[in-house]
A protein has these predicted regions:
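Charged substrate- and nucleic-acid-binding regions of tRNA-handling and nucleotidyl-transfer enzymes
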Residues: 1-8, 180-273
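Acidic/His-rich, divalent-metal-binding segments that scaffold phosphate/diphosphate chemistry
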Residues: 2-107
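Short acidic alpha-helix initiation/capping motifs at coil-to-helix transition points
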Residues: 11-13, 24-27, 61-64, 108-115, ...
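A general alpha-helix detector
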Residues: 15-19, 31-32, 68-71, 115-120, ...
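Short coil/turn segments at secondary-structure boundaries
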Residues: 31-38, 46-52, 85-86, 97, ...
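Short, well-structured alpha-helical segments
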Residues: 33, 131-139, 233-241
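A glycine-rich phosphate-binding loop feature that marks nucleotide/adenosyl-phosphate handling sites
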Residues: 51-54, 90, 133-141, 154-156, ...
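Divalent metal-dependent catalytic cores for phosphoryl transfer on phosphate-bearing substrates
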Residues: 70-187
Length: 273
């Protein structure tokens, strides 16, 4: 029976976090992980992982979930947070497996996996911030499902809002979680993520523009011109906003001069105001 503690490797390395990070950041991460699996080292560091070897993976067509997990880790960018999330993203599948309608399901495995990830990484000695980021990525790792069937703009906004500062890493994890050998399916998935990222950027730009305000408000424009409200005030405010977008913020006296020039050129078209 192996009596080595969870934070101690067979090589005598006392810090489990450093030991696992060394494996994940090696030049050949796939080879390093399989070596750690075969030697029993990974069972000391992350006892939940070997159970994935016995869990069939009907979705990704690997012989088991562990093979899929290591393939995902190998596809990730050189980012410790993303690689840790990839390592743990399916950790709860054995615990959540059920058989329904002749098939296998892993309902809510991301939520359960997030809790398991937090517990294991804390025991390994990772900093709290890293633990929170990785466990949150695991929790969010299934959020992209269903995008190809069509998401509303509100669903896209919710996805981006829930991911927050982890958005880039979440998308990197989702890209890496495609290990199919079907080139068309792989290309379709990458195209879907490209489309999601484009929509997020477009919606963010729309919201930024909607929140923009000219430096001078409508009341100040009316006071300066000595007029009441009307269509001309809205047009002047749009002109001032375009000036702000193209030239940045300008001194107020320069903006009032622009208002005077604009009003001199357009006043007649508004009749009596």
């Amino acid at each position: 029976m192996d009596t080595t503690s969870p934070t101690e490797t067979h090589d005598g390395v006392a810090d489990g976090a450093d030991a696992l990070s060394e494996i994940l950041m090696s030049d050949d991460v796939s080879g390093s992980l399989w070596s750690a699996v075969d030697s029993g080292r990974i069972e000391v560091l992350v006892p939940e992982l070997p159970a994935l070897r016995m869990e069939q993976d009907p979705i990704h067509r690997h012989k088991d979930v562990l093979s899929h997990t290591i393939a995902v880790v190998a596809k990730t960018p050189d980012d410790m947070i993303v690689r840790l999330a990839a390592l743990f993203h399916d950790i709860a599948k054995p615990r959540t497996r059920s058989f329904e309608h002749g098939g296998v399901t892993f309902r809510h495995h991301e939520v359960v996996g997030s809790r398991m990830t937090r517990k294991r990484m804390t025991e390994l000695g990772y900093d709290d911030e890293i633990v929170e980021e990785v466990s949150e990525l695991v929790r969010l790792s299934g959020r992209f499902k269903g995008y190809a069937e069509g998401w509303s703009d509100s669903a896209v906004r919710r996805y981006a809002r829930d991911a927050g500062p982890l958005l880039g890493r979440l998308n990197a994890l989702i890209r890496s979680d495609c290990t199919t050998r079907n080139k068309q399916k792989a290309a379709d998935l990458q195209a879907s993520i490209d489309d999601l990222e484009r929509r997020i950027a477009d919606l963010a730009e729309e919201e930024r523009r909607a929140a923009e305000r000219p430096q001078i408000d409508g009341q100040a424009v009316m006071t300066h011109l000595g007029t009441g409200g009307g269509r001309h005030i809205g047009d002047i405010l749009r002109m001032l906003l375009e000036v702000k977008r193209t030239e940045g913020e300008l001194p107020d006296d320069e903006l009032y001069a622009r208002i005077d020039q604009w009003w001199q050129a357009h006043a007649e078209s508004y009749g009596d105001v």
